[in-house]
């Protein structure tokens, strides 16, 4: 939101032969202060001693002087607009400019700021897809353009920051003649989901040469990923197992391998850095071997519990992760953190992690992490409090000591306007919901849609709160939009849970239409990382919006993503207590399928088909007959990458 006011001209002094970012900083200052009633003149001074991101702010006789490096001058301008004029850059569509405001400098202003992290990348949709907005949040990641001062850490476009083994040694090129290049698992060299044999000297030669080729092809890049692929199956051959045993970690063979690549890179291309993952099976640092100075290990928090801060958590994975964090911090001055900040099973599911974010970012800073990548719902807009989390994470990546209460007050008031107290009440009650610190119900990044920690009674109450919030901003177009999109987390969860659907069918039809309208209005909302899940869900909602309960519940044949090794389907409106026949249309590989229950460990039945039983052509396979129970869901798990499913059918037995 912007407020129209008198256009004013501000005198600006730039360095001789200004950089694009210096010119852009002056343009941004002029554009935003034009919406104010007054602002001092601006002088931009180049000072590369402050690094690319650091800046200094001074009041020089009533003139604002911003000194800094490539990005620092721009960040200094935005800092001044926020602190001294009260302008709030809250989201791509919401900027608050105080009515009749002015930019007033403190008389004794003279301060220098440096960021807590060299690389700051909150991977959320607004920040990832709008470089102007990213720069206003002092984000310095890949999407920044020359006028923003460019990106701080340039990764290769092929050997990026994760999962590059398959690119370095493609199986279709090498496996047939050299299966020994790949992981030995259960006594056999594994195809499909596999890793590399990291003690094989030929693998080292090939990978090193491939890295050389990428450096030659992309000389502007500084960082080149040599990183495990996104599954287990580390090599257990005699040599790899011996190294891992000696190092007391499966990162042992990995770090020795990456060090060997990096040693050759340093000889030929000094200044280039090899990045690798400390992820899942490689998370624990090796006992004996330290990473080289030109290796950047990226420690990933994927297994953690995210409601409670790491330093106060009693969760076993958080305790072990903190130990690993300290171990890697003792090994390197280039520690890179990959943190997780949303629910990847369902971006629109309420995910109350905000009060852990600041403490965790501070913990990373205190343990010498230099780079922070916070993966969020980057695939689509309006995930659970997406705009708030993007803004807060960005603030704390710059300075994790900023207190949370004033930040929350600023954001809620600016983003939700008159509805701020009601939305804040919902936010507080959501985060106050009790959760265990261990076991079923902990807040992990694949939170169940049916988690007992998110009671239906709370969702009903939350829906009423959002109704009230909508009423309060009905005459404010921007805040009305923000509230309507904010309530999607509650609306979609209620619709997907469909409690008492048959008796409340008109209500669910209206809810389906509301959700469909929101998706149509925005166009780039996503449910999760699962391919095909968006269209699957929207198709289901269209049937709900336009059909009777009888029609929807009778025949539930549904197309799904053809390539889906693991799949759970719980989005149906069943007739409770009636019997359905389940079957799946599959080809190519072995699979298991059955029915489980979200609310308990109860298994309603399953069936497994071996690869020998599954034909290469599409065929229907009967799974079981199922008496529908509340909170039950159908699941399908392909045992091999070749296993494909394109239809699941749940047909009521007459």
Q: What spans do the regions from the language model cover?
A:
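Feature activates predominantly on carbohydrate-active enzymes
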Residues: 8-10, 20, 25-28, 32, ...
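Short, well-ordered secondary-structure micro-motifs within conserved domains or adaptor modules
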Residues: 38-59, 65
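Structured mid-domain segments that build the active-site/substrate or prosthetic-cofactor binding neighborhood
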Residues: 202-205, 213, 316-421, 425
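Substrate-binding cleft/loops of secretory-pathway carbohydrate-active enzymes
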Residues: 275-303, 349-353, 381-390
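Catalytic domains of carbohydrate-active enzymes that cleave complex glycans
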Residues: 368, 393-576, 619, 646
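Extracellular polysaccharide-targeting segments
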Residues: 525-527, 621-629, 635-654
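Beta-strand acidic-aromatic groove motif in beta-rich domains, primarily in extracellular
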Residues: 588-600, 634
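Extracellular carbohydrate recognition and processing domains
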Residues: 600-631, 640
